């Protein structure tokens, strides 16, 4: 049976997007290059987060990133995030896996597991995740520390296995956004 959706109606992520832009583009639900709080909310719901977390994430993320990703533009109460400029919103106290331009730095990614995966070579336990966050925390950087903590805790809670391990391939997939697509597909296949 042929699909009722034409090729012109399907909006895809531009091929030239870097890893960080691809990560954020999942939340651009209509693929217009701008992420509004309602889209952030929809994206978090699509990957399996509850209403409260999705609401908090939409408000906090969009308020935090909107003005940073819209240089030279005035304040907007709709708190849009421009995907093309998301690199301008990279926060401190992070892992360094995204460089200043939003590109993936493989050596920094490998360093996460080389330094902090003590129990299993290719996975992090909750304790090891706390160690990672502590090691990456910059002095007097409350905001960056909170952002990093929130990102990693959501990832851990959504994706840890039955043994409480967050596997390397899962972490890798979050950096380019492909994990979000996988989670949405898994969730939609479970609902009637």
From Swiss-Prot:
Expressed in roots, leaves, shoots and flowers. Its EC number is 1.11.2.3. A motif (Proline-knot) lies at residues 71-80. Heme binds at residue 23. The modification Phosphoserine is found at residue 178. Ca(2+) binds at residues 28, 30, 32, 39. One of its GO terms (cellular component) is endoplasmic reticulum. It is found in: Lipid droplet; Microsome membrane. It is an enzyme of class 1 (oxidoreductase). Its cofactor is heme b; Ca(2+). Keywords: Calcium, Endoplasmic reticulum, Heme, Iron, Lipid droplet, Membrane, Metal-binding, Microsome, Oxidoreductase, Phosphoprotein. GO terms for molecular function: metal ion binding; plant seed peroxygenase activity. Residues 15-50 form the EF-hand domain. Belongs to the caleosin family. Transmembrane regions are predicted by sequence analysis tools, but these regions probably constitute hydrophobic domains associated to phospholipids. The proline-knot motif (71-80) may be involved in targeting to lipid bodies. Calcium-binding peroxygenase involved in the degradation of storage lipid in oil bodies. May be involved in the interaction between oil bodies and vacuoles during seed germination. PANTHER family: INACTIVE PEROXYGENASE-LIKE PROTEIN-RELATED (PTHR31495:SF1), PEROXYGENASE 3-RELATED (PTHR31495). This is Probable peroxygenase 5. It comes from Arabidopsis thaliana (Mouse-ear cress).
